Swiss-Prot record:
Catalyzes the 2-thiolation of uridine at the wobble position (U34) of tRNA, leading to the formation of s(2)U34. This is tRNA-specific 2-thiouridylase MnmA. Residues 97-99 are annotated as: Interaction with target base in tRNA. ATP binds at G11, M12, S13, G14, G15, V16, D17, S18, M37, G127. Belongs to the MnmA/TRMU family. The gene is mnmA. Pfam families: tRNA_Me_trans, tRNA_Me_trans_C, tRNA_Me_trans_M. GO terms for biological process: tRNA wobble position uridine thiolation. One of its GO terms (molecular function) is ATP binding. PANTHER family: MITOCHONDRIAL TRNA-SPECIFIC 2-THIOURIDYLASE 1, TRNA 5-METHYLAMINOMETHYL-2-THIOURIDYLATE -METHYLTRANSFERASE. Disulfide bonds join C102-C199.
Length: 368
């Protein structure tokens, strides 16, 4: 590639990953500018949101690198295309993954369009730990080489045409090396802690955030044997596989194993629990997925053996996937999997290549 006069707009978050991404692209000879996105307005004060500090750090890094930093507010787009869906899913008792939707609709849609249409960018870049590789004329998504930081799970909705306009400078690095590069360059973000929490919303307590927008409906907690144990504060506050903050004290029911959420009966507003992390009620043989996205934008038409992740940081699970009616996908696991959660994403891989994924609609219980 002839990189002379190729402009790259780097999404600057104020963290070390985006800082080093900008540095590496500069060293490769690209014309680099930064862009800081503000995507949240509510509760915008110091206790919850670090946006002012993040902006200051992003500006400081850009000053150190001698590049322009653009600032843009995408709060309305985030609300319409991410947060409303996030709330709607919780209202029906599901557990969504807003980071995936944020990548799809904000970082690799709104940001990409703004950078190319308004700032004259040839490419955008982010600090994601993934690799883009061109195969048979299409850009493909590969796992980052650092297994502990690989973020391909969150990018399965991004198509090959968008991927072709994106750089991921950290894909072949591990986090320790990224911090070493930042420290050697004297970047102010070299030792800054990684951000946590919901995409762009920061460290707000999830239960507090939900309670501001959704009216909780308390109900009964029962065991898998229909024994009443206590009360829950609202099904939206709980997810499958959860063991902490169930509010049932030391109740053991004759066993020393801890309690886990194994199901939610939405129609009767019941939280169902059982003891043991491998209780049969918590396990699934497979799932049905919808809202399917394939990186190469070719719809799957025949069964395929591959691997799947049903949550981030999960080891790959061998599976057979096959298309079924209503643009859905049936996924049959090679072995039972715990806490498959409707609303989360099932993401598919062929070796190191992330080929796509979908939203988990139904989990298939053991014996089905």
């Amino acid at each position: 590639m002839n990189i002379i006069n190729k402009k790259v707009i780097v999404g600057m978050s104020g963290g070390v990953d985006s800082s080093v991404s900008a540095l590496l692209l500069l060293q490769q000879g690209y014309t680099v500018e930064g862009l800081f996105m503000k995507n949240w307005e509510e509760d915008d004060h110091e206790q919850y949101c670090t946006v002012a500090k993040d902006l200051a750090d992003a500006q400081a890094v850009c000053n150190q690198l001698g590049i322009i930093l653009h600032k843009v507010n995408f709060a309305a787009e985030y609300w319409d295309n991410v947060f409303e869906y996030f709330l709607a899913e919780y209202q029906v008792g599901r557990t969504p993954n807003p980071d995936i939707l944020c990548n799809k609709n904000i970082k690799f849609k709104v940001f990409l369009d703004f950078a190319t249409q308004n700032l004259g960018a040839d490419y955008i870049a982010t600090g994601h730990y993934v690799i883009r590789k061109d195969i048979n004329g299409k850009s493909r998504l590969l796992r980052g080489l650092d297994n502990q930081k690989d973020q391909s799970y969150f990018l399965y909705t991004i198509g090959y045409q968008q991927m072709a306009r994106c750089f991921f400078p950290l894909g072949k690095l591990n986090k320790l090396r990224v911090r070493e590069i930042a420290a050697k360059q004297g970047l102010v973000t070299a030792s800054k802690k990684d951000s946590t929490g919901i995409c762009f919303i920061g460290k707000r307590k999830l239960s507090d955030l939900l309670s501001r927008y959704i009216s909780a409906k308390p109900g009964a907690i029962i065991t898998v044997d229909n024994e009443y144990i206590g009360y829950h504060q609202g099904l939206m506050y709980y997810t499958l596989g959860q063991r902490k903050k169930l509010g049932i004290g030391g109740t053991k029911n004759g066993s020393q194993d801890p309690w886990y959420v194994v199901d939610k009966d939405i129609n009767h507003n019941l939280l169902i629990i059982a003891q043991g992390h491998n209780h049969p009620r918590l396990m699934s043989n497979g799932l049905i997925a919808s809202k399917l996205y394939w990186v190469d934008r070719t719809t799957l038409s025949t069964p395929l053996r591959c691997t799947v992740k049903t949550r981030y940081r999960q080891s790959d699970i061998g599976c057979l996937i096959k298309p079924i009616a209503n643009n859905q996908l049936q996924v049959d696991f090679d072995y039972p999997v715990a806490a498959v959660t409707p609303g989360q994403s099932a993401v598919f891989y062929l070796a190191e290549q992330c080929i796509g994924g979908g939203t988990i609609e139904i989990r298939k219980p053991l014996g089905s």
